[in-house]
């Protein structure tokens, strides 16, 4: 039996509760996705089933912007931009719920999860865009899966790279502070990763390696010739 089969043969509740979950969060354009993808690539030889847990909110924003453009065109109005989008608590509830679903699917597939953001980060983005009742708090609190480590990507020394939905260069320092404050307040283990891409990757691997001692031995064995 291969190491991948040994993990997926385990009970689903066991996998959800025992997968090592590494969550990457950070302000806009702080190389969070870059680091997440590099970690997945690094660990794929050990865990062939490891998945890229991408940022659901980004695709949701593109879809919302596309729908707003369609509605504006039908009404004969100018094409809207990010500042024209109308966000609701329900939007953030959907984003938080779907982000957790992606994370859990990755936990069922492999004993190591590397997630590019999570429902707790969604809560902070909701704080940025909305005041009042939160739609994502339930998913960021009571329904948030167990975490092993948060990696917060620092904004310092990272140039801001704009795209059609990034609009928060002026808020990056505040967002970094919000992340570290809420992680500390809620008692999560977290580390601020800084420096070059290479340094961030090396530091992240050094932090993750000791956590892998908790992975079932059968899931860590090296694939041998003839394994089925």
Where are these regions (language model features)?
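Glycine-rich phosphate-binding P-loop
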Residues: 24-39
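C-terminal accessory extensions appended to soluble enzyme cores
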Residues: 2-9, 214-228
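Conserved substrate/cofactor phosphate-moiety recognition/catalytic segment
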Residues: 40-98
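Glycine-rich phosphate-binding loop used to anchor ATP phosphates in small-molecule kinases
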Residues: 88-145
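Extreme N-terminal, non-catalytic leader segments
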Residues: 1-21
């Amino acid at each position: 039996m291969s190491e991948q089969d040994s993990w997926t043969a385990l009970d689903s509740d066991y996998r959800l509760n025992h997968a090592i979950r590494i969550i990457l969060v950070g302000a806009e354009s702080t190389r969070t996705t870059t680091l997440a993808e590099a970690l997945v690539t690094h660990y794929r030889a050990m865990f062939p089933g490891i998945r890229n847990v991408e940022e659901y909110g980004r695709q949701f924003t593109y879809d919302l912007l596309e729908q707003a453009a369609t509605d504006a065109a039908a009404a004969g109005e100018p094409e809207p931009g990010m500042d024209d989008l109308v966000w609701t608590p329900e939007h953030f509830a959907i984003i938080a719920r779907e982000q957790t679903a992606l994370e859990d699917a990755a936990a069922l597939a492999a004993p190591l999860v590397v997630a590019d953001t999570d429902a707790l980060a969604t809560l902070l983005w909701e704080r940025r865009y909305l005041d009042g009742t939160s739609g994502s708090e339930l998913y960021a609190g009571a329904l948030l899966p167990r975490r092993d480590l948060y990696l917060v990507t620092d904004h310092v020394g990272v140039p801001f790279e704009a795209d059609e939905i990034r609009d928060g260069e002026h808020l990056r320092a505040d967002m970094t502070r919000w992340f570290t404050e809420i992680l500390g307040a809620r008692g999560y283990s977290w580390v601020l990763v800084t420096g070059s891409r290479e340094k961030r990757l090396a530091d992240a691997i050094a932090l993750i390696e000791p956590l892998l001692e908790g992975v079932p031995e059968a899931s860590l064995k090296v694939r041998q010739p003839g394994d089925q």
